[in-house]
Amino acid sequence: MLGRCGGSSILGGKMLIPLKIEGYAHQRFLRGCIMRDRVVIKWGGGLITDKSSLCTPNLEVLNQLASTVAECHAAGQEVILVHGAGSYGHLRAKNWRLNEGHIPGMLQPEGSICSSQRDAVEQVRREMLELNQHVCDVLNEVGISSIVHPPHQWATNTGMNFRGDLGRFNHPNGRKIHITFGDIVEVEGEQRFGILSGDDLVVRLALELPRVKRLVFAIGGVDGLLRVPPEFATEDDLIEIWSPDIEFEGVHQSDIDVTGGIGLKAARGAHVAAHEIEVLMVNGGKPERVLAAMLGNPVRGTIVTNKQ
């Protein structure tokens, strides 16, 4: 971290010289090249879309979140962005049971524009690219260009152990940020296809890319993990530090959501935290909190740990 060390060190035979430059407090220099610390941020699908209405973005929230990325980038951190699907994926995937993989002879759900599961797979992929374009557009408006990595083009299988080369996220990006998202990918064997959740993507990105300092989940409607259901919660019910042995309450819209909801986020966050990476959950509707979490500043939310 810049400003914390006045010496230098040798890593792999190369000189690493910490320097302090005004406005860039989170970067190092490797043989003259800026090596920024990284933060992986997950924008929840329910946060950036209207989950009750098919393919409807929440542009107000998207614009607010885009500003946090620009400010974090200006502060000297490199951002890796992963976003969820919300109403662009879950509703159609639920109707066609795409999370279960190939179902021989499945009948067309009433009112569906798709004629088969495979047709639905391709439609959801197109819709995810449409949502991603909204994300790229709001980022472009604040001066941030994007390098997009649709998982169906480079990843196979589902869960944390999916297969795919994450080196594509490691290329120098200047004023650009790398983006990926939850998607439907090909799966080996009889299943044929399945849903690769953004919550699984962030685990691998946080653990396998160098210089990642923290993982932030920007979630919708709540300040973090709660001791009671959200509709009954007061400010005192926020779990400020959570580990897997602590029970919590959360809303999982199983009638819509085909991934694991906030429970999956907590479990995946604990897995990352076990590797000494900071993990936080914050209210994504409060952009000042999202920015503070990305920068590692004190913020209202839940710190996820793996300590029992």
Predicted regions and their residues:
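N-terminal amphipathic/basic-hydrophobic helices that include classical n-h-c signal peptides
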Residues: 1-34
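Nucleotide/pyrophosphate-binding catalytic subdomain
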Residues: 23-24, 29-278, 284-292, 298, ...
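C-terminal accessory domains and tails appended to enzymatic cores
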Residues: 302-303
